[in-house]
């Protein structure tokens, strides 16, 4: 292959000069003689290409030889990647020796054509009450976990992986995009302790890595998930955190000298998001169900990054700081969270009516809060007092102990089937449990546990 030499280094951006007749294509991977991999981002003319470094550019100097590999970055795919931790280039970083893969795929691939895509309305039960009731997941759908800092996005995601791996025994791919190394480490040990590590491929590009790594690591993970899908499996693809993918794009964009757009984001924000999201789709052979954590800067859902992500999702799970401050975990906001699946034709009349009933009761309670704050409970009508009492029970019953949080809570995690969830909330709405004190509903699993607790009070 053609060889060139480094002519300029500005941080993570490196210009390489090649002979005029052998200029690499955009997205080709180049290898520096020091072992560093570069990815071509722009052709500047005159044999010059501008690249982004996928690793630290410390110690590089002008004149170093660079070889063109002739294709994009290629990463290992297939069952050999399960139980392993890899970096953006697919190299193992868990000190367990080589991956031993049978195939390598390019990380830049076309999305499946419209004819190949399939649309399923089958529900994926998560065992988390508030999600199964209010914003049910579709098998092969896209889910976003929206929340500010510290409201529980990663814990929710870990619980979902644990529940789905154990209850549905499917394969998962986890892409850690610009997250804390500590979380990556915790996550690995959590998967080991739950005995589900052999069903998960882990790909990490953490916070301390250069922007090129963080920008491409989501594509590395997605490529591995696509391989499982094309083998006819139903695979789960977890991204933590999609906001850092956008942020890495912003850094790269600035380094490449592009003019920023709104709030300083890259002008290509919507396109970059589309390139990733369009590939996360289900085909007639298999499905990819994706769960993406979305950090919301300053809790502002209208920020361009979360706003662009919203457009691609089937279900949005919004985590609220107000609910977390009440000590109700998972801190999902039942009035803000939505799902395209919550339709009587998909989930059935009973589920739909119970979910809307729960939202209606909580909405009414929200409206009455101002009156209660000014005049007190005694000024409410009997009907409104009943609404408030039931809403407070619903609020508490939406909380649930998690398996992955047993270390912190000291209580046993609970998996609640959809049938039990609907039965419990239907009972509360119909006044079946009006005699039970509200504290019995807090951090309980199914309604049977609540009744049992109340009998001991």
Curated annotation (Swiss-Prot):
The answer on whether this UniProt entry bears the keyword RNA-binding reads no
Q: Where does the source fall among the domains of life?
A: Bacteria
User: What EC number(s) are associated with this protein in UniProt?
Assistant: 7.1.2.2
Residues that coordinate or bind ATP = 147-154
Q: What UniProt keywords are attached to this protein's entry?
A: ATP synthesis, ATP-binding, Cell inner membrane, Cell membrane, CF(1), Hydrogen ion transport, Ion transport, Membrane, Nucleotide-binding, Translocase, Transport
Where is this protein localized, as stated in its record?
Answer: Cell inner membrane
Xref: SMART domains: AAA
Gene Ontology molecular function: any one? proton-transporting ATP synthase activity, rotational mechanism
Main site of residence?
membrane
- Reply yes or no: does the keyword Transcription apply: no
Give me the reactions it catalyses: ATP + H2O + 4 H(+)(in) = ADP + phosphate + 5 H(+)(out)
Stated membrane topology is: Peripheral membrane protein
**Gene Ontology CC entries for this record:** plasma membrane; proton-transporting ATP synthase complex
Per UniProt, subunit arrangement is:
F-type ATPases have 2 components, CF(1) - the catalytic core - and CF(0) - the membrane proton channel. CF(1) has five subunits: alpha(3), beta(3), gamma(1), delta(1), epsilon(1). CF(0) has three main subunits: a(1), b(2) and c(9-12). The alpha and beta chains form an alternating ring which encloses part of the gamma chain. CF(1) is attached to CF(0) by a central stalk formed by the gamma and epsilon chains, while a peripheral stalk is formed by the delta and b chains.
Extract the NCBIfam families matched here.
atpD
Family listed: Belongs to the ATPase alpha/beta chains family.
- Write out the function statement from the record: Produces ATP from ADP in the presence of a proton gradient across the membrane. The catalytic sites are hosted primarily by the beta subunits.
Q: What HAMAP family does this protein's entry cite?
A: ATP_synth_beta_bact
How is this protein named in the record? ATP synthase subunit beta
From which organism does this entry originate?
Answer: Actinobacillus pleuropneumoniae serotype 3 (strain JL03)
């Amino acid at each position: 292959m053609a060889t060139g030499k480094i002519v300029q280094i500005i941080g993570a951006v490196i210009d390489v000069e090649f002979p005029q007749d052998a200029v690499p294509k955009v997205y080709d991977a180049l290898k520096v003689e020091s072992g560093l991999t570069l990815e071509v981002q722009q052709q500047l003319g005159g044999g010059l290409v501008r690249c982004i470094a996928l690793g630290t550019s410390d110690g590089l100097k002008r004149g170093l030889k660079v070889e063109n590999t002739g294709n994009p970055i290629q990463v290992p795919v297939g069952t050999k990647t399960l139980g392993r931790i890899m970096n953006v280039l697919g190299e193992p970083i868990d000190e367990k020796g080589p991956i031993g893969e049978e195939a390598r795929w390019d990380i830049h691939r076309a999305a499946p054509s419209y004819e190949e895509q399939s649309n399923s309305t089958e529900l994926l039960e998560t065992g988390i009450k508030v999600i199964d009731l209010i914003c049910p997941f579709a098998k092969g759908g896209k889910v976003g976990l929206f929340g500010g800092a510290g409201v529980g996005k990663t814990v929710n995601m870990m619980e979902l992986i644990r529940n789905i791996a154990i209850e549905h025994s499917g394969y998962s791919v986890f892409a850690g995009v610009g997250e804390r190394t500590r979380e990556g480490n915790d996550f690995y040990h959590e998967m080991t302790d739950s005995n589900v590590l052999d069903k998960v491929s882990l790909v990490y590009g953490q916070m301390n890595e250069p922007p090129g790594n963080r920008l491409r690591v989501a594509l590395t993970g997605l490529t591995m998930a696509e391989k499982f899908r094309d083998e006819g499996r139903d695979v789960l693809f977890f991204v933590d955190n999609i906001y850092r993918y956008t942020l890495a794009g912003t850094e790269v964009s600035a380094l490449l000298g592009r003019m920023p757009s709104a709030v300083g984001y890259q002008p290509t924000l919507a396109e970059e998001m589309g390139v990733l999201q369009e590939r996360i789709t289900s085909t007639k052979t298999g499905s990819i169900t994706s769960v993406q954590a979305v950090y919301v800067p300053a809790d502002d859902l209208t920020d361009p990054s979360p706003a662009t992500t919203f457009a691609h999702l089937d279900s949005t799970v919004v985590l609220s700081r107000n609910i977390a401050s009440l000590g109700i975990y998972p801190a999902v906001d039942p009035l803000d969270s939505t799902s395209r699946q919550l339709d009587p034709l998909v989930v059935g009349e009973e589920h739909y009516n119970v979910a809307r009933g729960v939202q209606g009761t909580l909405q009414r309670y929200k409206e009455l809060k101002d009156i209660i704050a000014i005049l007190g409970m005694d000024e409410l009508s009997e009907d409104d007092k009943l609404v408030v009492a039931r809403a407070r029970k619903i609020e508490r019953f939406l909380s649930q102990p998690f398996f992955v949080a047993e270390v912190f809570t000291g209580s046993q995690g609970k998996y609640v089937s959809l049938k039990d969830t609907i039965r419990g909330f239907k009972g509360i709405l119909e006044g079946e449990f009006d005699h039970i004190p509200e504290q019995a509903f807090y951090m309980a699993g199914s309604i049977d546990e609540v009744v049992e607790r109340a009998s001991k009070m």
